[in-house]
Swiss-Prot record:
One of its GO terms (biological process) is positive regulation of neuroblast proliferation. Belongs to the IL-6 superfamily. Residues 1-22 form the signal peptide. It comes from Mus musculus (Mouse). Gene3D superfamilies: 1.20.1250.10. Glycans are attached at N44. The keyword Secreted applies. It is found in: Secreted. Keywords: Cytokine, Developmental protein, Glycoprotein, Secreted, Signal. This is Cardiotrophin-2. Pfam families: PRF. Binds to tripartite CNTF receptor complex consisting of CNTF alpha chain, LIFR and IL6ST (in vitro).
Amino acid sequence: MYCLLATPLCLLSLLLPPLSPAAPISPSEPIGQAYSLALYMQKNTSALLQTYLQHQGSPFSDPGFSAPELQLSTLPSAAVSFKTWHAMEDAERLSRAQGAFLALTQHLQLVGDDQSYLNPGSPILLAQLGAARLRAQGLLGNMAAIMTALGLPIPPEEDTLGFVPFGASAFERKCRGYIVTREYGHWTDRAVRDLALLKAKYSA
């Protein structure tokens, strides 16, 4: 390192010992951050789903509405048996969660666009959808930090939506939004369980 002037920064750089590039990164901190965010997200998932349903009209807004049979091929389901879930390795657990929240960020953007057209006068719903998308993106970043700390490869980002039929009817768009907001809640619940397990395993 060449220093033409004896500036304070230059002198400081000469006095400080070099950083070791091989210093291990503890996963406990990013796991704790991700767990805290997932818990915060979990507190808001039911409100998001109920707000969404209330703005779609019948049958969505009818008391007790539920359609678990509705699924999207572009969005992985969070449903998994306890035995299968508990037997997962860390890499698989994190990879599946990251893939799901990547898909959710893209689907929440689509649902937000749909609702801007279907319910332009509903700022609360649009704000909640936008906040959910940003939190999902934040959790994605936390997941990537955990995988880096554990020395695991980070899956490349993919276009999970593919080609979206722009001619979808209003009812089809409402169904799509219902599935996305429902699965957002289910995946958040699963992420809390995933991260609680990792938190106990890698506690500082």
